[in-house]
Design a protein with these regions (language model features):
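ATP-binding N-terminal substructure of ATP-dependent carboxylate-amine bond-forming enzymes
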Residues: 1-100
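Active-site nucleotide/adenylate-binding loops and adjacent lid/helix of ATP-dependent enzymes
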Residues: 103-132
Length: 132
C-alpha cells in the first residue's frame, strides 16, 4: 500500500459488496473489510480483512482509529449502517449523522419523529421488553 493511498473500511462481506470493492480499487482505494464471518466471499477481494462484528460499534471505531481510515460504509448490510454513522461522527468523517440513522432504523423513534413534526401517523407505542 502506498503511503498516500486512501483507505476505506467496508462493513460486511456478502457477495453484494464485490462490485463495490472493485469500484473502490478502480478509484485507487485500499479496501478493508470486516465482519465476524471470515469465509464471506467479498473478503477475498479486499486488500485486508478483520474479524470484528459490524454491530460492535466501539470495536469497529477502535479498528478505524488504528487503521487511520479515510472513509467507512455499509453496502447492502443494514446492521452496519448504524455502526458506519457512529464511526463517521466520532472521527469527523463524511457520512450520515448517527442520530438520523438511529431514528430511521428504529420504528418507535421514527414514529415519534413523524408525530413531533406534524406528519399523520397512526397511534403507536414502542416496547423494549416483554414485561412492558
Amino acid at each position: 500500500m502506498a503511503n498516500n493511498q486512501k483507505k476505506i473500511l467496508m462493513l460486511g462481506g456478502l457477495r453484494y459488496l464485490i462490485p463495490v470493492i472493485q469500484a473502490a480499487h478502480e478509484l485507487g482505494y485500499y479496501v478493508i473489510t470486516c465482519d465476524y464471518l471470515p469465509h464471506n466471499v467479498a473478503h477475498k477481494y479486499a486488500d485486508e480483512y478483520h474479524n470484528i462484528s459490524i454491530t460492535d460499534k466501539n470495536a469497529v471505531l477502535e479498528l478505524a482509529k488504528e487503521l487511520k481510515i479515510n472513509g467507512i460504509m455499509s453496502f447492502a448490510v443494514d446492521p452496519g449502517v448504524l455502526t458506519a454513522a457512529y464511526v463517521c461522527d466520532k472521527l469527523g468523517l463524511p457520512g450520515n449523522p448517527y442520530t438520523s440513522v438511529q431514528i430511521l432504523q428504529n420504528k418507535a423513534l421514527f414514529r415519534s419523529f413523524l408525530e413531533k413534526n406534524g406528519f399523520n401517523t397512526p397511534k403507536s407505542r414502542g416496547y423494549n421488553s416483554i414485561e412492558e
